[in-house]
From Swiss-Prot:
Family: Belongs to the D-glutamate cyclase family.
Pfam families, per the entry: D-Glu_cyclase
Organism of derivation: Natranaerobius thermophilus (strain ATCC BAA-1301 / DSM 18059 / JW/NM-WN-LF)
EC code: 4.2.1.-
Record-linked NCBIfam families: PRK05463.1
Domain of life assignment: Bacteria
Entry protein name: Putative hydro-lyase Nther_1142
Keywords: Lyase
GO molecular function: lyase activity
Lineage of source species: Bacteria, Bacillati, Bacillota, Clostridia, Natranaerobiales
Amino acid sequence: MTWKQNETEIRQRIKEGQYDGPTTGLMNGFTQANLVILPQNLAYDFLLFCQRNPKPCPLLEVIDTGKYEPKETAPGKDLRTDLPRYYIYRDGVKSAEVTDINKYWTQDLVSFLLGCSFTFESFFLQRGVPVRHIEEGVNVPMYRTNIKCKDAGVFHGNMVVSMRPIPENKLTEAIQITSRFPAVHGAPIHIGSPEKIGIKDLDSPDFGNRVNVESGEIPVFWACGVTPQAVIMNYRPEFVITHAPGHMFITDKKDMDYFQL
């Protein structure tokens, strides 16, 4: 057994900064989450933004002001250390990329955990639906689109999507699987024709890495929890912390906890 198959060792390596890579494919079966941390004076507007845009921003948990333990999704864990990599934004611009946010922590911060599409990938693998970024050992490709989100207070902007190439004969199955997970982005937001949602070049993702789209495959797009980062860049708040795209928080929840019949 390698360390990547050992739950305890994975968590320990991430906490200690020994692993700072993408979390796709790690601890299959455990739900992963996007993280947004912002000052209390912005928390209500962001909560409203998530409620109005549940496809890209499905709320899993909101942590009390100044607290960093996600008691609902991962009791005993610490959001300041338990992600592989974080982005620090100042005035809407990424100013640092770190593996520990203890020195940035203040008592007025509110943390939000949002559902992540990595959750349904283990079901793809079980059913023989390929997950190209796992096959190629890279981060999932993510793209800005022309799909507008609903405004909420100071927050406004367009949706970010993740893309997975799906063989034509597996497309229906992929849609059926993901539609059972509304808490983690659910069914695709768009299928094929990337130009129709404002994506000019699949080989040039805005976040993550490019993957190969093979003959007989269709690019399929899911709403993505990196959307808040794009929205934050629009508003340019003084200070925000997020996960680095693809470097998620691994909760104690199981993927099946979010499966709906």
